[in-house]
Regions:
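C-terminus-biased signal that marks the final domain/tail of proteins
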Residues: 1-111, 199-241, 246-358
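Flexible glycine/proline-enriched surface loops and loop-helix/loop-strand junctions
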Residues: 60, 187-194, 268
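Internal mixed beta-strand/loop scaffold within catalytic domains of large alpha/beta enzymes
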Residues: 97-192, 209, 330-333, 342-344, ...
Length: 358
């Protein structure tokens, strides 16, 4: 049985950050409004049914001051999204702080697996990087090209209503991210804001500095890779950060800590993330098996890998699981930053990838 055609639309937004947000909100209005109910009914209600939508939105206001302090331009974008979609700002804050709010809800919808390779590991020496993003079924997402007046253009993919942190920019920087589970969270900058801020940097060193110096609310893994062959992985927590350098010009990551001093604090196996160890091992195994031959089309096949199904690199929905655990890969992205290209697909086992260019 063949894969389904990929008819994804690439949305393009330009101007000031407020204008970009307004265009985003207008273009994706129906989806953004639908996602408010999605987050409440599909994500939070199964785990914390006693918490109302109004309470979630009120809690999300805690992100306003951290965002204004560290990334005021994205506060403008979020306000623009609310204006364009015709919804209260608190709804947009709730959607963009959903991963932070989710810390209090013990739900598992599958784990993300990311990778990067360059130099001798790749067929042509160019950097290739990407990931699968796993979440619960029903989440809407979109491919976007963002061209701000005052920074690099971005090409990426995001859940509708959220900022873009999965993709690349026109300076040759790619950024990807994986959830981590750590015993502490604080009132800080939401991970989506940190991710888009990193993706908006003109170089790997500046992206690294941005991630390291922004006070995050929860633990998150950031993988950044550049057209010149620089790449690094940063495991961020509210307390301290761990840094992982390439091994044989390859980095792979899933949803557990790899930095030795952070591993004792890892809680991945306590909230259904046990498969993270197998996914990371499998991705590393595939990349080592094809060392020196790695390129975009081949790594896209890795992202289709179903070993360990339904919780392999490409997660598949299992209707027999409880709703609170039922998830899978909702989108997949592969980038070659030197070429300014991204290949994006819904679940790649079921759909073809579609190529987009900055």
């Amino acid at each position: 049985m063949g894969r389904k055609p990929n008819n994804m639309t690439l949305y393009e937004f330009k101007g000031t950050w407020r204008q970009i947000g307004q265009q985003y909100g207008e273009a994706c209005r129906d989806g953004i409004r639908a996602m408010t109910s999605f987050w409440k009914d599909r994500v939070f209600a199964p785990a914390i049914p006693h918490v109302s939508l109004d309470e979630l939105m009120e809690t999300a206001t805690q992100f306003v001051e951290p965002i204004k302090t560290c990334a005021p331009e994205y506060m403008e974008e979020l306000e623009g999204i609310a204006e364009g979609a015709g919804i209260p700002l608190n709804e947009v804050l709730m959607q963009n702080g959903a991963f932070e709010l989710n810390v209090a809800a013990p739900v598992y919808f599958g784990g993300c697996t990311s990778f990067a390779a360059t130099g001798k590991a790749t067929k042509d020496g160019k950097t290739v990087a990407g990931q699968n993003f796993d979440w619960c079924d029903g989440a809407e997402f979109a491919a976007m090209k963002i061209v701000p007046n005052d920074g690099p253009a971005i090409l990426g993919v995001a859940i509708v209503g959220q900022l873009v942190m999965f993709g690349l920019n026109d300076r040759g920087v790619s950024h990807f991210a994986n959830e981590l589970v750590y015993p502490k969270s604080v009132v800080g900058v939401p991970s989506l804001v940190v991710g888009q801020k990193a993706l908006s940097q003109p170089s790997i060193p500046k992206a690294l500095r941005c991630i390291a110096q922004t006070p995050c609310a929860i633990a998150l893994n950031h993988l950044i890779a550049g057209k010149d062959g620089d790449m690094i992985d940063i495991e961020v927590t509210p307390d301290k950060n761990g840094y992982i350098l390439p091994d044989r010009e390859i980095i792979t990551h899933a949803n557990h800590f790899q930095t030795p001093f952070l591993q004792p604090h890892d809680m991945a196996d306590q909230i259904f993330f046990v498969d993270t160890y197998l996914r990371d091992y499998r991705m590393r195994q595939l990349m080592e098996d094809y060392y020196g031959e790695l390129e975009a089309q081949l790594t896209m096949e890795f992202l289709r890998d179903k070993r360990g199904c339904p919780t392999g690199i490409c997660g598949m929905y299992d209707p027999e699981l409880p709703l609170i655990e039922r998830g899978g890969t909702i989108f997949s992205i592969c980038t070659v930053p030197e070429e300014g290209k991204a290949w994006i697909a819904p679940n790649p086992v079921e759909y073809e990838y579609r190529e987009f260019t900055l």
